[in-house]
């Protein structure tokens, strides 16, 4: 199962994540305690032995172009309402692997209806991977009844409040293609190898 451990800030964190993650990510152009500068991101991307997503909430095509050209990344993770034509233009010009986030509410009165509306939104985009999240790295769990429905139609990456205690049961319920974690493997705002190792083991223990 695809494991992405996001929000790295230092080469030391990267070294830890390379032992357990298939992908990682650097936070740029958004409000986040994990945000780093372009030069730091470029350095992490250059030295990494695993793919590094450049993660941002920007809706501006020019901002994404700057991220690509200044960091050298081939992987983008979009956490915004950027329109589908802009995504298409970026992909056509740069050929990047794009993972687009779609927001899932924390609680839903009508999960089937919410799922269908989100599916319609997803179908507007030509992207390489679909990420279902509670919203912009807030670390909150969303209504998995919705993501469970969507996961039956698409290979989704699941994010939002995942940690060592809940990831196994959530995977069994939703059956995602992969998982994306950040705050759930942190201690005092830094990536914790013990938590990352436990998270990895709990993910790999699930047989779908």
Swiss-Prot record:
Keywords: Amino-acid biosynthesis, Aromatic amino acid biosynthesis, Isomerase, Tryptophan biosynthesis. It comes from the Archaea. Pfam families: PRAI (PF00697). Its EC number is 5.3.1.24. The keyword Isomerase applies. CDD domains: PRAI. The keyword Isomerase applies. GO terms for molecular function: phosphoribosylanthranilate isomerase activity. InterPro entries: Aldolase_TIM (IPR013785), PRAI_dom (IPR001240), RibuloseP-bd_barrel (IPR011060), TrpF_fam (IPR044643). Pathway: Amino-acid biosynthesis; L-tryptophan biosynthesis; L-tryptophan from chorismate: step 3/5. Belongs to the TrpF family. PANTHER family: N-(5'-PHOSPHORIBOSYL)ANTHRANILATE ISOMERASE (PTHR42894:SF1). This is N-(5'-phosphoribosyl)anthranilate isomerase.
